[in-house]
Amino acid sequence: IDADGPRRLRLLVAPDGSAELQVLEHRIHGDTPWAVPLDLEPVPSEHEFLFHKTTVREVYDNARHRFPDAPDVLLWNERGELTETTTGNLVVELDGELVTPPVLCGLLPGTQRAELLDTGEVVERVVRREDLARVDAAWMVNSVRGWVPIEVDSAARPAGVSSSGA
């Protein structure tokens, strides 16, 4: 592998058992919080592909296309419950606890999330959109990037919309 800087590996396995190894750029996030918009549309909490790590990423891709300049997008379901981001699980500090939404809200049960629950570092609790006003801190977590601090960017504009709303 001829690479400048950190890389991550992705192993894709097809239904016929064939495999492909991809080498991808690994962005280092640093300590600066990512400005993450709240998606415009809810995700269906029972969408079958939200619960499995797969290349079928339509729900995530659609959110990213709505906000192409954002490093990530915060998702929520039809009940107004926060779920995850397009690249990882959500952890928020709320009422003095580190909280992650339950899988039944419609999200991938990531390996980093599972470890945090197993060690008791986080607890599961429904986090509603209106709870964002009370959140003391928030992170996107996954096993590749670790804990990435995020802040909800209410000023973010979807693709094709200027800051004047035109």
Language model regions located:
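Helix-start/capping segments and mature chain N-termini
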Residues: 1-166
